Design a protein with these regions (language model features):
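C-terminal catalytic/motor cores of large multi-domain enzyme assemblies
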Residues: 1-112
């Protein structure tokens, strides 16, 4: 995970400086579109060809939720997944979102 974090920082820095190499930005199969930092709660993205899917990430919003039969204020975030059904069926996309939800809610599981 540490190496992934270092790679992400490196790519982000070079992307902002417009110094990524062509081979580093082509050949993707999945796109993540994040408008959450602009306060957008949810949105639907259009799949970039030749990708198989795109995930839209909304802003983190505090809302009342029920935890252990009690109403508490908790951070929530909406994710939307659009899949090209020629390559990914809805059930597989749903399983992906459920797994991602579990990791976001329980990040310690990433280390197990």
């Amino acid at each position: 995970l540490n190496q992934i974090g270092l790679n992400v920082k490196d790519f982000a820095s070079r992307a902002q400086e417009k110094k990524l190499l062509q081979n580093e930005i082509e050949g993707s199969t999945f796109t993540i579109s994040n408008l959450g930092m602009f306060g957008i709660e949810s949105f639907t993205s259009i799949i970039n060809q030749p990708n198989s899917a795109i995930m839209s990430v909304g802003s983190i919003i505090q809302k009342p939720v029920i935890i252990n039969d009690k109403i508490v204020i908790s951070n929530t975030m909406k994710l939307t997944l659009a899949c090209d059904h020629r390559t990914i069926d809805g059930a597989s996309g749903s399983k992906f979102l459920l797994t991602l939800k579990d990791f976001v809610e329980n990040p310690i599981k990433l280390l197990l």
